[in-house]
Design a protein with these regions (language model features):
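A charged, well-structured terminal subsegment
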Residues: 121-149
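Functionally constrained cores in energy, signaling, and assembly domains
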Residues: 6, 12, 24-30, 74, ...
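N-terminal, charge-rich interaction modules
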Residues: 1-57
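A short, terminal or domain-edge coil/loop segment
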Residues: 2-7, 79, 141-149
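Cofactor-cradling patches in redox/metallo enzymes
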Residues: 35-37, 46-116, 121-130
């Protein structure tokens, strides 16, 4: 009986990693690089990833593109509406440093000051292959027991 509980926990983590539901917030070119994952190029549903319309059903929150001071409130509200465990991916240079809008008074330079970020995907914009690598890394981390937030 004592071996059953770790086996159930492991199998729950594997099932969670194999069926990620995603909500996104995109404002710039990072979104364009995600198109191959939505279409037949990489077909995210083949990996068990499904885009959902409401944060209440989402496991993963993807933020791409520049974030303004006004938009950060929306991002925080989306994050707060997600059930636990929840995971956050930031795509591209804009959520990390403000990107090419770094010198604007209205641009948020680091999104991780407002919501916790679990995975950063580098690039301006990030290539679809890098996004895929990040998704696989996230799946492996969840399988390995990473509990998110």
């Amino acid at each position: 009986m004592s071996n059953l509980i770790p086996a159930v926990i492991r199998s729950k983590a594997e099932a969670s990693a194999a069926s990620l539901w995603v909500i996104h917030y995109f404002t710039a070119c990072g979104f364009l690089e995600l198109f191959p994952w939505v279409g037949s190029g990489y077909d995210m549903e083949r990996f068990g990833i499904l885009a959902v319309a409401t944060p209440r059903h989402a496991d993963v929150f993807i933020v791409a593109g520049y974030v303004t001071q006004k938009a950060v409130r929306r991002i925080q509200r989306i994050y707060d509406q997600m059930p636990s465990p929840k995971y956050v991916m930031a795509l591209g240079s804009c959520p990390m440093t403000g990107g090419m809008y770094w010198d604007s008074y209205a641009t948020v330079k680091r999104i991780d000051k407002y919501i916790p970020v679990d995975l950063w995907v580098l690039g301006c914009p990030p290539k679809p292959e890098n996004i895929g690598h990040g998704i696989v890394m996230a799946m492996n981390a969840i399988k390995g027991g990473f509990g998110g937030h």
